């Protein structure tokens, strides 16, 4: 399955919520003119009642799109989450949050996860003193994530940090915006993450 390259706002409208795919320079609700609850397309205003399977599928698609992950990779994350001890749904979210591209985004070095993925792929990110260019790399507790020295002058990184300063900072991360460096202090708990995600529906979908 190819990665989606079309309009980002269309995906948010498809899921009926802000997927945080845009930089945040302008509120997505403003740009969509309060159309987030209207699906894209000619018949978008019609909202058919979803079956249980339909609701489960929509939730999976929403989370997959938030983190920018293809179907096969997402299923692999679920398999790993199911193998680990504890709640499978929560394990899944923790694995997704531990991706290097997501951590780079959460630390404020990139305005979107897609931009963070690009920074990682272009070797602009260092983990524990070593360049890592794999977006799916799993960050561990106490890992130090830094913007590579020669990349610190990039205007987009500085702009992203400015945007991040206006958002609530994740409590499981410690970030020094001046040094462009952060520490993955602890594994996030479910209460730290979005309440707008219903991971139980995803577990039900894959458990069939």
Swiss-Prot record:
Q: Kindly list the GO molecular function terms attached to this UniProt entry.
A: rRNA binding; structural constituent of ribosome
Q: List the disulfide bonds.
A: none
* PROSITE patterns in the cross-refs: RIBOSOMAL_S4 (PS00632), S4 (PS50889)
Q: Which GO terms describe its cellular component?
A: small ribosomal subunit
SUPFAM superfamilies hit by this protein:
Alpha-L RNA-binding motif
Pfam families named among the record's database cross-references: Ribosomal_S4, S4
Q: List, for all copies, the residue spans of the domain called S4 RNA-binding.
A: 98-158
Q: What keywords are annotated for this sequence in UniProt?
A: Ribonucleoprotein, Ribosomal protein, RNA-binding, rRNA-binding
Q: Name one GO biological process term.
A: translation
Q: Does the keyword Ribosomal protein apply?
A: yes
The reply to whether Ribosomal protein figures as a keyword in the UniProt entry is: yes
Summarizing the function annotation, the protein's role is: One of the primary rRNA binding proteins, it binds directly to 16S rRNA where it nucleates assembly of the body of the 30S subunit. With S5 and S12 plays an important role in translational accuracy.
What is annotated about its quaternary structure and interactions? Part of the 30S ribosomal subunit. Contacts protein S5. The interaction surface between S4 and S5 is involved in control of translational fidelity.
- Family, per entry: Belongs to the universal ribosomal protein uS4 family.
PANTHER family in alphabetical order:
30S 40S RIBOSOMAL PROTEIN, SMALL RIBOSOMAL SUBUNIT PROTEIN US4M
Q: Any idea what this protein is called?
A: Small ribosomal subunit protein uS4
Lineage of the native species? Bacteria, Pseudomonadati, Pseudomonadota, Gammaproteobacteria, Pasteurellales
């Amino acid at each position: 399955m190819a990665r989606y390259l079309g309009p980002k706002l269309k995906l948010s409208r498809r899921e009926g919520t802000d997927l945080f795919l845009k930089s945040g320079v302008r509120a997505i609700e403003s740009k969509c003119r309060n159309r987030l609850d209207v699906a894209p397309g000619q018949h978008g205003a019609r909202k058919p009642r979803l079956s249980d399977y339909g609701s489960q599928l929509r939730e999976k698609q929403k989370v997959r799109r938030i983190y920018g992950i293809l179907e096969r990779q997402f299923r692999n994350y679920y398999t790993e989450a199911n193998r680990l001890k504890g709640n499978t749904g929560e394990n899944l979210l923790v694995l997704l949050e531990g991706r290097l591209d997501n951590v780079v985004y959460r630390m404020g070095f990139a305005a979107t996860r897609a931009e963070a993925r690009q920074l990682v792929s272009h070797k602009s990110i260092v983990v524990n003193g070593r360049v890592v260019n794999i977006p799916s790399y799993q960050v561990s507790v106490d890992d130090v994530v830094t913007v590579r020295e020669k990349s610190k002058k990039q205007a987009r990184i500085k702009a992203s940090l400015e945007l991040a300063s206006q958002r609530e900072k994740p409590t499981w991360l410690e970030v020094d915006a001046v040094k462009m460096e952060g520490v993955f202090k602890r594994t996030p708990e479910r209460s730290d993450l979005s309440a707008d995600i219903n991971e139980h529906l995803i577990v039900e979908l894959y458990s069939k």
